[in-house]
UniProtKB/Swiss-Prot annotation:
Gene Ontology cellular-component terms listed: cytosol
Family, per entry: Belongs to the DNA mismatch repair MutS family.
Protein name: DNA mismatch repair protein MutS
Keywords for the protein's UniProt record, in alphabetical order: ATP-binding, DNA damage, DNA repair, DNA-binding, Nucleotide-binding
Binding site for ATP: G621, P622, N623, M624, G625, G626, K627, S628
GO molecular function: ATP binding; ATP-dependent DNA damage sensor activity; damaged DNA binding; mismatched DNA binding
Function: This protein is involved in the repair of mismatches in DNA. It is possible that it carries out the mismatch recognition step. This protein has a weak ATPase activity.
PROSITE patterns: DNA_MISMATCH_REPAIR_2
Organism name: Halorhodospira halophila (strain DSM 244 / SL1)
């Protein structure tokens, strides 16, 4: 019988033991959650929970007697290793209610009192063993608002970072959820807002949790204020509603106050460059298109030496700012560190504990001894960091030096209270240092002197009994004893009382040894109780200093992120970008930050110039020639600049950018029933509706998924709208050579191409961007590189010659126009005649960018040209 069914009869107690009635009563409160029910040194699961856990964790499923006439399925995990099991369950999207023994088994009649102390869910993790150290673990709530708006609230319980924002529509909400990538999402049960894809666990909560007035009261109580104006949130009804619903969920699952959540950040969409969900995926900022983390921007840029610095750096990359003052301050700080100080800063920070998350556990009362030594070691580094920062010419670094503080009293307390290398938990003692507390020292002394006393007692009893093999010992079951062999046991004094009989020995106790046992065991118990009380008080004392300690933790994270930017600038030859007041993008010698690191050969740098007279670069050239790389590197350079980092270029000047759009690559969206072409058109529509004159737009191969004329017509109309109506700064790559005529029609459209050199039927990609349109597509040569069979290539060449001569033959499948006559496009722009092709090819060569094989093929090609 299932646990949920059994719970219905638990109240009358028929057929159930008292302990099982207790279990069923508690389980009834958490019907959808796995219940870890503490029994001694194990957490046990029963009924359906046991069967589910056995499958998910690959642990043994057994039974425990009978209840209501049926065997009870049971499985269990040791308390000592519970975190590893919780980690596996949470990764599978499960939630676990932790039910602890809160009564004393020695004084309780019947089942010991138990209660659920916490529900572990994917979005409420705080233990290091359950978290990814460089990724935020966010709990996010979404509340629908008026006029199609949405309120979004996010909390990282493991650090206390709490933020809200308002999304104006569904598209913006999707973009924000793609940026945040929450571990758990809270939605109202009466709303049709879809949960995002990608492993996020969605929880549907009662609609009354999303009632504004009660949500606002919860938020005010949490922040300890009577008004939200100081946080800039008083008028944000939907975000406040989301924040209150989030806090209601935490109240139910955590069963504890959250003192480390004392501030609220309102994120304005106008403060940051907007990047929609598709563009964020295409740019591969933290995750590649396969969902992994290799070959991403973060994998190249994040060399931070602390986990909290890495998380902050990734937030900066995910949310490049538009606020010039903040970005300029970061650039100045990176420049000051890059002059040499970054190495000293990083070596001082190396090995620093994750102070943000430690402080969260301090606030929640779950900090362990090694958390406190990690905090102590981190705080001991602050004076050296302050000295280093005081020598640097940067206002932001000077401010960070002040925010670090030195916390001398806290450092002194931790140095006196905790031993250098404490055990993992305080359960068995040995955490508090000698000399910290007189009472504890006295109790420990009594226990430690026991060995000397027992050695003396053993010598006395041997002399008194004349038995040289007599020994005094101890075990946990019977306590202290005097042991002699069976053959000698009949001659013991009357004061000896038999305690235990073994196969070859007898064990006795004497009144003197009994008194000593009571004193020692009492001293040990009292010492352990005293140590636990001292530890709890120590954690409470640290919690009272939470706000200044959190400020220092934030400063440490920011310093680490800035030092990582500086290290990348020095190691990878990045330059400080210039921020201009006038719109435009000018990049000299730009490089793709990720591709550059993945190549064995030197990366071929290229220039980009977009301004009022060059609003659109129409890019042609062969597949594999580097068009997509060229476009992506432009967007990534802009993103890095506005995140506060230096950029891979010889020079970069960037004007204001409000949005970055990328329409690069596409695949079928099978889950939503959308074809590749439908995905492409949806993304294109989003760009045409939302791009502005200050947007950076990347468009790659629009119109590939339909017929040639349809695709060309759509690409032409899209490019015209971007160039003439929207006037966004656009990189537009195409294989439709007819589109190069746009340069002759619309001012601001400029043709550029990716260069390649041909040798017979082979092609060498030079990856250099040149003005003017490409003179051919090299499609057959690329097909040959891909391994297309020679017979197919031969047939393709014959068909190509036929098509180019105008005699394409009657295929019998002419396309009928859907809306009228097929469009008539202006003739494509013709490339200027090349007076000396050999000279032109040599001038355009980049020797450093050629592999040995490319160089050899180029030489053969040049020789063939000379013969002609």
């Amino acid at each position: 019988m299932a646990a949920t069914q059994e719970a219905e009869t638990a109240t009358n107690g028929a057929g159930h033991t008292p302990m099982m009635r207790q279990f069923l009563r508690i389980k009834a409160e958490y019907p959808e959650t796995l219940l870890f029910y503490r029994m001694g040194d194990f957490y046990e699961l029963f009924y359906e929970d046991a069967e589910r856990a056995a499958k998910l964790l690959d642990i043994t499923l057994t039974t425990r007697g009978e209840s209501a006439g049926a065997p009870i399925p049971m499985a269990g995990v040791p308390v000592q290793s519970v975190e590893s099991y919780l980690a596996r369950l949470v990764r599978l999207g499960e939630s676990v209610a932790i039910c602890e023994q809160i009564g004393d088994p020695n004084t309780t009649k019947g089942p010991v009192e138990r209660q659920v102390v916490r529900v572990v869910t994917p979005g409420t993790l705080t233990e290091d063993a359950l978290l990814e150290e460089r990724s935020a673990n966010l709990l996010t709530a979404v509340a629908p608002g008026p006029k199609g708006r949405f309120g979004v609230a996010s909390l990282e319980l493991s650090s206390g970072r709490f933020s809200v924002l308002e999304a104006p529509d569904q598209e913006a909400l999707t973009a924000e959820l793609e940026r945040l990538r929450p571990a758990e999402l809270i939605l109202p049960d009466d709303d049709q807002t879809p949960a995002p894809e990608g492993g996020c666990v969605a929880q549907r909560r009662p609609s009354w949790h999303f009632e504004y007035d009660s949500a606002r009261r919860l938020l005010l109580r949490q922040l300890g204020t009577h008004d939200l104006s100081g946080f800039g949130a008083e008028e944000l009804h939907a975000p406040v509603t989301a924040a209150g619903a989030l806090l209601q969920y935490l109240n139910e699952t955590q069963r504890a106050a959250l003192p480390h959540v004392g501030a609220l950040t309102v994120e304005s969409r106008d403060e940051a460059i907007t990047i929609d969900a598709a563009s964020r995926r295409n740019l591969e900022i933290e995750h590649n298109l396969s969902g992994g983390t290799e070959h991403t921007l973060a994998s190249v840029i994040d060399t931070s030496v602390t986990a909290m610095g890495g998380r902050l750096l990734r937030r900066w990359l995910q949310r490049p700012l538009r606020r010039r003052e903040t970005i300029a301050a970061r650039h100045a700080a990176v420049a000051a560190l890059a002059d040499g100080a970054f190495a000293d800063v990083r070596s001082t920070l190396e090995g620093c504990a994750d102070v943000e998350r430690i402080l969260a556990r301090v606030a929640l009362g779950t900090a362990r001894p090694r958390d406190l030594t990690g905090l102590r070691d981190a705080l001991e580094r602050l004076p050296q960091l302050q000295i280093l920062l005081g020598q640097l010419n940067s206002h932001r670094l000077q401010a960070l030096g002040v925010e670090l503080d030195e916390h001398p009293q806290t450092v002194d307390l931790l140095q006196r209270a905790i031993i250098d290398t404490p055990p993992a938990t305080v359960r068995d003692g040995g955490v508090i240092a000698d000399g910290f507390d007189g009472e504890l020292d006295e109790l420990r002394s009594m226990s430690r002197n026991a060995d000397d006393y027992l050695a003396a007692l053993e010598a006395e009893e041997r002399a008194a009994t004349g038995i040289p093999t007599l020994k005094v010992g101890f075990n946990r079951v019977h306590g202290y004893y005097i042991e002699v062999s069976r053959s000698q046991s009949g001659h013991m004094p009357e004061r000896y009382t038999r305690r235990q009989t073994l196969k070859a020995a007898e064990r006795f106790i004497t009144p003197e040894l009994k008194r000593f046992e009571e004193q020692v065991l009492s001293a040990r118990e009292r010492a352990l109780a005293r140590e636990k009380a001292l530890y709890e008080q120590l954690v409470a004392d640290l919690a009272s200093e939470l706000t200044p300690l959190q400020r220092s933790a934030s400063a440490l994270a920011e310093l680490d992120a800035l030092a990582a930017f500086a290290e990348r600038a020095r190691s990878l030859d990045y330059v400080q970008p210039e921020l201009a007041d006038t719109p435009g993008v000018r990049i000299e010698g730009g490089r793709h930050p990720v591709v550059e690191q993945a190549l064995d050969a030197p990366f071929v740098p290229n220039d980009v110039r977009l301004d009022n007279r060059r609003r659109m670069l129409l890019i042609t050239g062969p597949n594999m020639g580097g068009k997509s790389t060229y476009m992506r590197q432009t967007a990534l350079i802009a993103l890095l600049a506005y995140a506060g980092a230096f950029v891979p270029a010889q020079r970069a000047v960037l004007g204001p950018i409000d949005r970055i759009f990328t329409r690069i690559g596409a695949a079928d969206d099978l889950a939503s029933g959308r074809s590749t072409f439908m995905v492409e058109m949806t993304e294109t529509a989003n760009i045409l509706h939302n791009a502005t004159a200050e947007s950076l737009v990347l468009m790659d191969e629009i119109g590939r998924g339909t017929s040639t004329f349809d695709g060309l017509a759509l690409a032409w109309a899209t490019a015209e709208r971007l160039a003439t109506r929207i006037r966004a700064f656009t990189l537009f790559a195409t294989h439709y050579f007819e589109m190069t005529a746009l340069e002759q029609i619309h001012p601001g459209v400029v043709n550029v191409h990716l260069e390649a050199a041909e040798h017979g039927e082979r092609i060498v990609f030079l990856h250099a961007v040149r003005d003017g349109p490409a003179n051919q597509s090299y499609g057959l040569q690329v097909a040959a590189l891909a391994g297309v069979p020679q017979e197919v290539l031969k047939a393709a060449r014959e068909k190509l010659r036929s098509l180019e001569s105008g005699d394409g033959g009657d295929t019998g499948s002419a396309q009928l126009p859907l809306f009228g006559p097929e469009p008539v496009f202006p003739p494509p722009a013709q490339p200027e005649p090349e007076p000396d092709p050999i000279r032109e090819a040599v001038e355009n060569l980049d020797p450093d960018g050629l592999t040995p094989r490319d160089a050899l093929e180029t030489i053969y090609w040049l020789k063939a040209q000379c013969k002609e």
